[in-house]
């Protein structure tokens, strides 16, 4: 379970959100909504332990994330606006590197399959620097098919993804939640239309 307690964030003398509290349980799929500038990215970064807040706390499995960041990040997959991939490596090498850093053992056929899922079949050995921005983001998204982490925090994961790709990712997010994981995301795309499994948390306008 993830708990957000009395969270307040101020940026450039604006209160983005104040005394924000909610809980997210295993098996939940949550979309953070709000107009541009309401603090969606700020909130995700704070929850991921990558941003600061004026007051409040985040608890994961009833422990404050600040007290054991290493353990928390072992359970967390965060995908932000920056893809975190290495341009000098190929798509295949990037995923091998990611898995090694996170001490996961996955064979190459599974990596090839993950890249195929995001539409990069045949591009596995191309240096990332030669891929388009959308293709580079797909390399980062391929991690989702390989991850064993229970908590996914995804900031605009559908940027530059076509309609078919959105459908594939939507199915993956639902599957992760059905298996007891948690997905927290922001998106401007119309996903999960009328899906009862989706919970929405809306941020108000800054003060």
From Swiss-Prot:
Family named by the database record: Belongs to the ABC transporter superfamily. CcmA exporter (TC 3.A.1.107) family.
Primary role: Part of the ABC transporter complex CcmAB involved in the biogenesis of c-type cytochromes; once thought to export heme, this seems not to be the case, but its exact role is uncertain. Responsible for energy coupling to the transport system.
Cellular component GO terms held in the UniProt record: plasma membrane
GO molecular function, one term: ATP binding
Domain ABC transporter: 2-204
Protein name as annotated: Cytochrome c biogenesis ATP-binding export protein CcmA
Keywords per UniProt: ATP-binding, Cell inner membrane, Cell membrane, Cytochrome c-type biogenesis, Membrane, Nucleotide-binding, Translocase, Transport
PANTHER family: ABC TRANSPORTER I FAMILY MEMBER 1
Catalytic activity: heme b(in) + ATP + H2O = heme b(out) + ADP + phosphate + H(+)
Main location per the UniProt record: membrane
Listed SMART domains: AAA
List of residues binding ATP: 34-41
Membrane topology recorded in Swiss-Prot or TrEMBL: Peripheral membrane protein
Annotated GO biological process: cytochrome complex assembly
Subcellular location: Cell inner membrane
EC number: 7.6.2.5
Record text on subunit structure and interactions: The complex is composed of two ATP-binding proteins (CcmA) and two transmembrane proteins (CcmB).
